Amino acid sequence: MGTIRIRTGVRSAASAAIAAAVGVATLAACGGSDGSAPSGDGGSDGAKSKTVTLVSHDSFNASPAVLKEFTKETGYTVKVLKSGDAGEALNKEILTKGSPQGDVFFGVDNTLLSRALDNGLFTPYEAKGLDRVDASARLDKEKHRVTPVDTGDICINYDKKYFTDKKLAPPQSFDDLIKPQYKNLLVTENAATSSPGLGFLLGTVARYGEDGWQDYWKKLKANGVQVVDGWEQAYNESFSGSAGGEKAKGDRPLVVSYASSPPVEVLYAKPQPQQAPTGVATGTCFRQTEFAGLLDGAKNEAGGKALLDFLISEKFQADMPLNMFVNPVVKGVALPELFTKFGATVDRPETVAPDRIAANREQWIQSWSALVVK
């Protein structure tokens, strides 16, 4: 499959908002201001190196305190190397296979997992504590080439004010979106260029099957769905319910985003509202799972294994929601109040097996593009 340009979605906006508070401090905790390793530890040069390099997409964030805790427990300092969006970062690792940029890769999700595995990017390693990870997230449980780290749900978000003002119930299912009362209300991202756009497409494949998803999209197109390149444009420009969309005078009260988007709207509003301005149609969700793996040819294999153990520790898992706006995969890790109060609980998300995605992804995207954006 060709290169997919992917926006990680809600975390892109969150990353910008917390860059000063978290991002700069993270670099300080991980190394020099340019992202280099602290002097004297030799970078990621071999078994004796005390630096372990984590290669990730641009939306990786962790609190400095948690990264310092890892150093305290293991003696290793984390160097974070951000390599673009998820698809771009994966492509770079494929191009440097065998001589990787770092020791651990974080951020490949279930829509692209097969590409990473088929290219032999990872050395198998069963992380300590993997038995505490929800079984549904362990998609490579036989070979342990990757370790599940987080989950998120791609769902329709709606502008509460719009539907209240119109005295119209917001849609709750895929079937609702093709009803005439929701004509010209939805904006989605291009499935060929956007992670949430692809996830939404896969959700319709799961819901309607190989024989029905194209007919569904014909009806959605006839009902006035708008398609834009990426999440940033859809959510922060076209969607009327977001702070950015309100400023840009967006006119679409329905958007493909994440179940964690409403808490983000609350967190960064000044003053914080008592209720989220947006809601989630929980019957339209596709489950996204992100993984990390020990890169084949890693210079600091021992450090990489220690980092994989830490990524599924309770300390790191509890730190993720307010830094990357994702859900922990370790059972029993509590979500922060912001999530439980303003977020949506998705009990039955749509899923597609990674091997099925691998066999059909290119064909699905090509068929979708010809049908919807031609």
Where are the regions that the model predicts?
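C-terminal motif of bacterial Sec signal peptides marking the signal peptidase cleavage site
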Residues: A25-A29
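Early extracytoplasmic/lumenal segment of secretory-pathway proteins
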Residues: G31-D34, G42-R115, E237, K374
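A structural signal for short loop-to-beta-strand junctions that line the ligand-binding cleft
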Residues: P100-F105, T123-K160, D175, L185-A191
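Periplasmic solute-binding protein
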Residues: N110-L121, K141-A169, G197-R207, R287-G293
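Short beta-strand->loop
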Residues: T123-D131, R145-T147, D175, P253, ...
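Ligand-binding pocket segment of bilobal, Venus flytrap-like solute-binding proteins
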Residues: P196, G203-G283
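Mature extracytoplasmic/periplasmic domains
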Residues: A292-T351
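Extracellular/periplasmic bilobal clamshell ligand-binding domains
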Residues: E337-K374
